[in-house]
Amino acid sequence: MPHAVAVFNMRNVKGDVTFTNKGANVLVEAIFTKLPVGEHGFHIHMAGDLRGEGCKGACAHFHKGSRPGTHGGLPGSKRPRHTGDLGNISGTGTYKYTIRDLSAEELFGRSLIVHEDADDLGLGNEADSLTTGHSGRRIACAIIGRTMESC
């Protein structure tokens, strides 16, 4: 049973993302039914404030821990990464991730963002590669909230 959900219902992006606690980890399942062509960076951001052009109020990528973290690849990657770095999505379909040492409840009120461009996973030569993956502007955003099953 999912504990948290984020719903994308924008003109260019449609989909549901659920977060289910599995022991000390959280299973993330994203199902997109509409997505622009190409690869898009996909991240959990710190805040659920979607005000402002391009969801600027969502702040930076979410990172659990005392250090700010460095941008990186998918959950489970051996390279350093922000807790909220989910790599790239491309096309409609289902994407699944397991994020270790995190609960769905820690994500309540945060946001999910789909970016315009591919995430370089922190491997690029651009100035923002180690903070945002040089993934471009924010094209869709959704707040992560409690599911009715978790009430």
What label would you give each PLM region?
Residues 1-39, 44-151:
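N-terminal leader/targeting pre-sequences
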